[in-house]
Amino acid sequence: MQRHMLKSKIHRAAVTHCELHYEGSCAIDEDLLEAANIVENERIDIWNINNGERFSTYAIKGERGSGMISLNGSAARRAQLGDLVIIAAFAMVEEAELQAGWKPKLVFIDEGNKIKGHRDHVPTQTWT
């Protein structure tokens, strides 16, 4: 059996560009792509923390070290500059891989879209 699992997540990225008349996609700083194990042309889901929008597109490389998160084409209508987004990619994973310890790559970034940490799991949510 295969399960559809979270593979990669870039958490709380700030949108730096919106290019309505670009061909489409989301350009992401190449450093962030590599850290999250997202490859060019891979399908990604984007969840806008500011307005609740959720949509899918594909990743393209943005300039390395730039902090770029550019929503292009129709995706540019789903966010404003400075909105915080979560970028996620999923994979089909065999049950045996899960049992062997398969883990996602979660990347946490700061206000300038620079990497501040990594994790391989989402902590158990508790009441506060």
From Swiss-Prot:
Q: Which GO terms describe its biological process?
A: alanine biosynthetic process; pantothenate biosynthetic process
Q: Which UniProt keywords apply?
A: Autocatalytic cleavage, Cytoplasm, Decarboxylase, Lyase, Pantothenate biosynthesis, Pyruvate, Schiff base, Zymogen
Can you summarize the PTM annotation of this record?
A: Is synthesized initially as an inactive proenzyme, which is activated by self-cleavage at a specific serine bond to produce a beta-subunit with a hydroxyl group at its C-terminus and an alpha-subunit with a pyruvoyl group at its N-terminus.
- InterPro entries for the chain: Asp_de-COase-like_dom_sf, Asp_decarbox
- Binding residues annotated for substrate, in chain numbering: T57, G73, S74, A75
Subcellular compartments: Cytoplasm
Q: Which cofactors are required for activity?
A: pyruvate
Give residues where Pyruvic acid (Ser) occurs. Answer: S25
Q: What is its EC number?
A: 4.1.1.11
Any one GO molecular function term: aspartate 1-decarboxylase activity
Identify the CDD domains for this entry: Asp_decarbox
Q: Give the cofactor note text.
A: Binds 1 pyruvoyl group covalently per subunit.
Q: What is its main location?
A: cytoplasm
Residue ranges crossing the lipid bilayer per the database entry: none
Lineage top rank: taxon: Bacteria
- The active site consists of S25 (schiff-base intermediate with substrate), Y58 (proton donor)
**Catalytic activity of the protein:** L-aspartate + H(+) = beta-alanine + CO2
Give the record's pathway. Cofactor biosynthesis; (R)-pantothenate biosynthesis; beta-alanine from L-aspartate: step 1/1
UniProt-listed PANTHER family:
ASPARTATE 1-DECARBOXYLASE
- State the function annotated in the UniProt record: Catalyzes the pyruvoyl-dependent decarboxylation of aspartate to produce beta-alanine.
- Subunit comment for this entry? Heterooctamer of four alpha and four beta subunits.
Protein name per Swiss-Prot or TrEMBL: Aspartate 1-decarboxylase
Q: Which organism is it from?
A: Burkholderia multivorans (strain ATCC 17616 / 249)
**Gene label:** panD
